[in-house]
């Protein structure tokens, strides 16, 4: 199923800050690590993203007096969920998880370092216009299909998948190599439900590692 010339595995924010014990812990986030390592053995090429925030970043609830984590405010680029302080530049929890084998990772994209704008997607800042440079690198290398794994399903992975589709890539989400946050939206729905419906409607393929032969 994998075309070693045109397929690439993308690892999204596989950092302790998003795992149990981290500042913005995703339930079972650490369970993605062994699956990701199995996937890495199947691919010849990989890239990784790293959330990398300065202190006082505008997406932190602590930067907005009177607000709490998971409140939603309006920023110049649109709605913004406010997060606990996390992925602080240079901190141990902002590093990649130490058990992830980065041998095949050919490029690392740091995101979220601009103080006044958040960055979920591997391709664009949250204004959906400012590029990270990843698209140009992938095109120069001739990659056409992106397999995504990492954290969190309903934010950084989902936004990455959506932008990749918009840019003309085929996208496969490795469901057992991802975990989500699930922010409540009301009516019993969460951001996980919304993300899944949106991505399926866009044509993102959802599979698990056993379907890939990993």
Model segments located where?
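Active-site-adjacent betaalpha module
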Residues: 1-10, 14-18, 22-25, 31-45, ...
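Short HxH-centered metal-ligating active-site micro-motif
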Residues: 50
């Amino acid at each position: 199923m994998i075309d070693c010339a045109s397929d690439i595995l993308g690892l999204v924010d596989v950092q302790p800050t998003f795992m149990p014990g981290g500042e913005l812990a995703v339930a079972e986030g650490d369970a993605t690590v062994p699956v990701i390592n199995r996937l890495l053995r199947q691919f010849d090429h990989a890239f990784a993203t790293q959330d990398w925030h300065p202190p006082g970043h505008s997406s932190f609830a602590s930067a907005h007096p009177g607000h709490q984590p998971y409140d939603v405010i309006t920023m110049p680029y649109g709605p913004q969920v406010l997060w606990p302080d996390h992925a602080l530049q240079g901190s141990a929890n902002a590093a990649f998880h130490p058990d992830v084998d980065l041998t095949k990772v050919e490029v690392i994209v740091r995101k979220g370092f601009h103080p006044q704008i958040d960055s979920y997607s591997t391709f664009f800042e949250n204004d959906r216009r400012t590029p990270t440079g990843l698209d140009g690198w992938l095109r120069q290398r001739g990659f056409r299909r992106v397999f995504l794994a990492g954290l969190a399903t309903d934010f950084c992975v989902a936004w990455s998948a959506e932008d990749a589709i918009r840019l003309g890539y085929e996208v496969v989400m490795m469901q057992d190599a991802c975990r989500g946050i699930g922010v409540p939206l009301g009516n019993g729905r969460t951001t996980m439900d919304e993300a899944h419906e949106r991505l399926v409607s866009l044509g993102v393929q959802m599979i698990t590692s056993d379907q890939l032969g990993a």
